[in-house]
Amino acid sequence: MSLLGFLKGFLGTSRLSEMARGYLEAALWVATDEDGYPLDRDYSLSDFSTETVAKAERDCQEFASANAELYSRIGIGEDKAGHLFWLVRMGSGVSFTDDFKTGTVEMQIAKKLDTSARKYGEAHVMPNDEGELDIFTG
């Protein structure tokens, strides 16, 4: 890795919010390349483009602004909230509700979080022409 690449990665990801870090780690973990191998085999957080990191921060901030009180009430921290936000958004089968029993207040809150995350729609992680990772929506 070049010094420029190292500095870009360090400066770009060392300042990530906990939520955006969890969000991008989940995105990297579940995405696959054209051969079906997980992207985290060959890429790390420092490989996301600057624009993608900024967009992830904005999406996470927007989600947190609307939902932080809810996820903190049920004991979910910022990192896990970001992780679950990505997975629920993607329709992966993982849910904020997974840790709660039916009929509980926590389950009702978690269902609201799922609904909020799904509103963002699916997104896909793909390498761009510069070898960085971008997230495409729609």
Model-derived regions: residue spans:
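Long, contiguous N-terminal structural blocks used for assembly/anchoring
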Residues: 1-77
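Long, highly charged low-complexity segments enriched in Glu/Asp and Lys/Arg with interspersed Ser/Thr
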Residues: 128-138
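Residue-identity detector for threonine
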Residues: 13, 32, 50-52, 97, ...
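Amphipathic protein-protein interaction modules
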Residues: 57-130
